[in-house]
């Protein structure tokens, strides 16, 4: 019968794998290392995705447990700055539910908001952490958020901060903030968490950054996250007195 020499088979296979192994090692050695900023966004994004099922379950329980009443708690609809701060928001307010995404603006945030309203999953306090990704029709969109807010809820607007244009009164981010301040004066259920003001007062968290996303290394990322969460929590505490 046919005799198979195992050595004759394994030796060619072994040598055929050498180029593949070398290529893999080269890729590993030359792949760019991600910085603190990218790593933080990646980790927070993964954590948020991991908690989606838990959030959905909690929301469903809240709806069934309060047929006609508004469920207690806080829903955050935010952008990449809120995503960056999500870890500290959850530390400051463990029951908070954060839905934040990179590049989200007022327009795309409104779609998320409307979906949450349709699904009856908005919690009592709704935090809109949007505006850094500017839009021309910010007034119209903010008005829609207010008009569509279901009865029994309150709205907290986190003012946007862009350090590159922070002192330019004609910039869209600054104008968006100004309009949010006006809305808070007009409606007794609308409040402002002035992240812009906090950011101005803490230049130490902006060294080495793009002046939109706080922190260039672990210490300043942590400091920025704590300040962001503190700004939001203080406003919510005042609103719920």
Annotated model-derived regions:
Residues 1-74, 119-121, 227-241:
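N-terminal secretory targeting modules
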Residues 75-77, 156, 191-193:
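Hydrophobic/aromatic beta-strand patches that form the interior of the parallel beta-sheet core
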Residues 151-155:
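A short helix->loop->beta-strand "cap" motif at the edges of active sites that frequently abuts
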Residues 60-144, 164-167, 171-174:
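Conserved SGNH/GDSL esterase-like catalytic core that processes O-acyl groups on lipids
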Residues 1, 168-241:
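Catalytic His-Asp segment of secreted/periplasmic serine-dependent ester chemistry enzymes
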Residues 159-160, 176:
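Extracytosolic low-complexity repeat regions of secreted or lipid-anchored proteins
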Residues 99-101, 158, 193-198:
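Conserved beta-strand termini and adjacent loop/short-helix elements that scaffold enzyme active sites
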Residues 129, 158-159:
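Alpha/beta-hydrolase-fold catalytic nucleophile elbow
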């Amino acid at each position: 019968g046919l005799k198979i020499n195992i050595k004759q088979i394994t030796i060619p296979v072994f040598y055929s794998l050498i180029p593949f192994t070398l290529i893999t090692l080269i890729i590993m050695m030359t792949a760019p290392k991600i910085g603190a900023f990218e790593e933080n966004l990646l980790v927070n994004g993964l954590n948020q995705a991991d908690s989606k099922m838990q959030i959905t379950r909690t929301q469903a329980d809240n709806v069934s447990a309060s047929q006609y009443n508004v469920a207690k708690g806080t829903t955050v609809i935010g952008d990449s700055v809120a995503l960056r701060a999500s870890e500290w928001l959850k530390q400051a307010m463990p029951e908070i539910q954060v839905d934040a995404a990179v590049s989200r603006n007022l327009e795309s945030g409104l779609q998320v908001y409307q979906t949450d309203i349709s699904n009856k999953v908005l919690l009592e306090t709704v935090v809109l952490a949007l505006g850094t990704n500017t839009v021309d029709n910010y007034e119209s969109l903010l008005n829609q958020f207010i008009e569509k807010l279901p009865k029994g809820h309150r709205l907290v607007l986190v003012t946007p901060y862009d350090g590159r244009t922070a002192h330019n009164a004609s910039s869209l981010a600054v104008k968006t903030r100004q309009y949010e301040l006006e809305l808070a004066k007009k409606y007794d259920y609308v409040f402002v968490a002035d992240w812009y003001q906090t950011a101005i007062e803490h230049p130490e968290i902006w060294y080495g950054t793009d002046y939109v996303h706080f922190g260039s290394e672990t210490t300043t990322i942590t400091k920025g996250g704590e300040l962001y969460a503190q700004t939001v929590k203080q406003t919510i505490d005042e609103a719920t007195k």
